Amino acid sequence: MLITSNAKTQLEDTLAKMAEAAELDKTRWSRLNTAYEAISKWLSDDPEFFGGVEIEIYPQGSVSIGTTTKPYGKTEFDLDVVIHIKLLSSNYDPKTIFNEVVRRLNENETYRKICEPKSRCVRLNYQGDFHLDVVPGCMVIIYNHELIDITDQKNEIWLRSSPKGYQKWFLDIANRVELTLLEMTFSAHKVEIEEYAKKKPLQRAVQLIKMRRNIYFDQNPENAPTSIILTTLAAQFYEGQSSISETFEGIISKLKNHIETLFPNRPFELPNPVNPSENLADIWVDKPELYKHFISFINNLHNEWQDLKKAHGIEEEAILMKGMFGNDPYIKAMEARAETVNQKRGNGLGILATGVMVDRAVEKSLPVMPNTFYGD
């Protein structure tokens, strides 16, 4: 973690560490990979329906684009994986495919205990780790490995989707910036770039927006905007900024202006960027009150960010950041900072009140840039 008196860089570092604290950790990543590989093997070994059928299983949603966030006040993550069954959807009805997946999972004693069929997925509840929503689907066209028809067994229809296409669309936008502000700062200080600093500003901004969403709607989660709405809008309003703070502010400010200028009283459509015929915000048509909650959330988020920019001193900034993004992520970010300071001191480095890090062994000092805060 970076230690600097530059307020903009220090804020950037704190935001990144807070987002990292709320994301899927390496241990659960490993368990997730093990879980969906086991599911794939169990289906493929089916002697009745799936035996001999090619099955590809892969993550979708936040897992695939690097924007996972733990639900507020809970220990389990909500994660999605796709079971891409290489059978043409035109040859089967969705209910048959869905029921065969449920049937096969229930033949396994472990899965039977944690299996919960939903409308479009089968949820596997891995206690203390994550809820894994397994989404079955079939090929639309032979040799097209992105397009998929997923099952909606409740309405007995196929729903066109492209999880891989959406992943590519989002990551192409996120990767418009080659080096993040944190990467450049690490390099300027001739320090090895830590992994948390390499995640793109758009990914971090989406994580932070969802973290604030989870807290804001904690008492009424049914009113919260979906992650796909927030993620898609964030990517559409992103302009390639290299810092998390500029990305966050740019997205929220542009979105607020978009609403006030064009859609103050009625919901707007949000076409799926990889399937334009699908309106990702169709729920606002059926439940317009949810759009009002969305507007209130964006306005509140904008106002809170402006307050954070005007914060005077560490204590005020801490109160605002914990209120926006959660107490635990902030504490973990500060613990990481304290650990870094202790390591530097143990290596013979001292940090002066001026923000200069001193190497006492060779009596050299590394100056830190003047104190400037983003937006001032």
From Swiss-Prot:
Enzyme class: transferase
Biological processes per GO annotation: defense response to virus
Record EC number: 2.7.7.65
Reaction it catalyzes: 2 GTP = 3',3'-c-di-GMP + 2 diphosphate
Disulfide feature: none
Keywords for this protein: Antiviral defense, GTP-binding, Nucleotide-binding, Nucleotidyltransferase, Transferase
A Pfam family it matches: SMODS
GO molecular function, one term: GTP binding
CDD domains: NT_2-5OAS_ClassI-CCAase
Keyword GTP-binding among UniProt keywords: yes
Comment field (misc): Bacteria with this enzyme do not have other c-di-GMP synthase enzymes (no GGDEF or EAL-domain containing proteins), suggesting this second messenger has been co-opted for CBASS signaling via STING activation.
Function: Cyclic nucleotide synthase (second messenger synthase) of a CBASS antivirus system. CBASS (cyclic oligonucleotide-based antiphage signaling system) provides immunity against bacteriophage. The CD-NTase protein synthesizes cyclic nucleotides in response to infection; these serve as specific second messenger signals. The signals activate a diverse range of effectors, leading to bacterial cell death and thus abortive phage infection. A type I-D CBASS(GG) system. Cyclic dinucleotide synthase that catalyzes the synthesis of c-di-GMP, has no activity with other NTP substrates.
Record family assignment: Belongs to the CD-NTase family. G05 subfamily.
Stated name of the protein: c-di-GMP synthase
Organism in which the protein naturally occurs: Roseivirga ehrenbergii (strain DSM 102268 / JCM 13514 / KCTC 12282 / NCIMB 14502 / KMM 6017)
